[in-house]
A protein has these predicted regions:
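Membrane-interface, cytosolic juxtamembrane amphipathic helix immediately N-terminal to a transmembrane helix
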Residues: 7, 97-140
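Membrane-protein extramembrane domains
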Residues: 58-82
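Juxtamembrane boundary at the C-terminal end of a transmembrane helix
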Residues: 147-151
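Short, non-transmembrane cytosolic segments of multipass membrane proteins
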Residues: 73-104
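Residue-level recognition of alpha-helical structural elements
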Residues: 8-11, 33, 48, 64-67, ...
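Juxtamembrane/interface alpha-helical elements of multi-pass membrane proteins
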Residues: 1-60
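A structural signal for well-ordered alpha-helices, especially hydrophobic packing surfaces
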Residues: 23, 48, 56, 60-63, ...
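Canonical alpha-helical transmembrane segments of integral membrane proteins
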Residues: 140-146
Length: 151
């Protein structure tokens, strides 16, 4: 349970980094989304690079697919690839509307998504800390019970 929570927090950290990176690439470099995803994937570990490479490849093919469709399809099943749950993935999937927005609106949406991911991460970190205390107390109590039984 605790390890799963730690894995979710790690994945959220990666997602937050991704959206910070996207913010700087789109805001300062004025890069296209396919280029942003390729650059981000080259700098990341875990399940994210696979997803981002697939999105970038499909965007570069320019076969008439809608960005929203590509983004939604590639993030479907991401729970298996990187341990994220529906709550985080639904926030990430909201980025799918980006294909139709200008740079300013993209940056605003990216910032909003990043902030929501940070809120989820902060909540999970507090939960992890609280559960850590509970596990410590339960461990100490079970140790005392065993020692009393043996005495």
């Amino acid at each position: 349970m605790r390890e799963r929570l730690k894995a979710r927090i790690r994945c959220l950290g990666q997602a937050i980094w991704l959206f910070r990176f996207m913010e700087s690439e789109i805001g300062y470099q004025k890069s296209e989304l396919a280029v942003v995803f390729e650059r981000a994937a080259d700098r990341m570990e875990g399940g994210f690079p696979k997803i981002l490479h697939r999105v970038a490849k499909r965007l570069q093919l320019r076969n008439g697919e809608d960005f929203k469709k590509i983004w939604q399809e590639e993030w479907t099943g991401a729970e298996k690839e990187n341990g994220m749950l529906g709550e985080e993935l639904s926030v990430i999937r909201e980025f799918a509307t980006q294909g139709y927005q200008d740079v300013h609106m993209q940056l605003m949406q990216i910032q909003m998504i990043r902030e929501r991911l940070e809120q989820i991460k902060n909540r999970l970190e507090a939960e992890l800390q609280q559960k850590g205390r509970i596990y410590l107390c339960v461990g100490m109590l079970s140790g005392m019970v065993v020692s009393i039984i043996l005495i």
